[in-house]
Amino acid sequence: MLKLRSVLLLFAAVSASSLGVQHSVSAEATYPVVDLHVDLPYQLGFHGKPLRQGMGQASLTDLRAGAVVGVVLPLFVPHDVSPTGPRKSDLEDSYLRVLGELFHGDGLALPGCGEAPGVQTWLSFEGAGPLADAPESLDAWVARGIRIVGLVHTEHNALASSSGDSHPVDYGLTEAGKVLMRRAHALGVAVDVSHASDRAVSDVLALARETHGVVVATHSNARALCDHPRNLTDDQLRGIAATGGVVGLNFHSAFVVRGRAATLADVVHQALHLVRVAGVEHVALGADFEGGIRPARGVEDASHFPDLARALRSAGLTQAAVRRVFSENALRVLCRSGK
């Protein structure tokens, strides 16, 4: 706990200095931010956009303006990379591209938890299917900086069924998925259920009661407010909280509200519901910037995090609660993961 408190103090100092936040700005606008899901590696791998640039939602300039002190960068390999599906070599290529960018120049740093200046970064898997036939290889990936393992992405794989696959079968967590999840939790790594089907989420939460590991949803919202399969039921939210995990508030309009373009007020409504159901210690930020999303109006890019902070304060959250949601809860998971 003492180390985590020191990290938070360091991040607070960074957010007011090297990230370019003016000391004259109201304290309400300078809450340090840790975002659990920023798809800059996707832009790098498939559009050739440097990590510092992206497509304009989470550029280094936007991150600095939003007082972002840490981001989780997901490594993603689509199923159509090769005729036989994603391979571990494809994952290696993705990792090496990201690593090369992180150590080229300044502004982004690996690893996180205060070991280096700049915007701290952690790595996650978004769809760990390539590891299904070699779960022991996860050990090496954790040594390389992986702190969160998302078992599945938008299509079913050998580990779990997806909420986004066009085939309606929902087979849940497979035996291979259970093996990998047990290994992840043995290594102290959190398991991510964003993109997992309902049955898969239930299976993961059930197994977590045996493994005593942390389950997170890095970029998902409440289904009670927006009935979308990518969102979570209240029971699922409570189940994640019971593991000590967090749910990352997603800014994608289609996951915030149904039938119209979402606004900042709708994002606040989602945040308040997550806090009420999961508890303030189990809500974080996972905006999903750079992932091909249409952000809600008022939070179009990372520079608008201070606007969200002010809106949450106006809606009744205390400064301490906003600090928890904006960084402390995420850091609790990330800085203990892999240990």
Please give the residue ranges for each predicted region.
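Positively charged n-region of N-terminal signal peptides that target proteins for export
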Residues: M1-R5
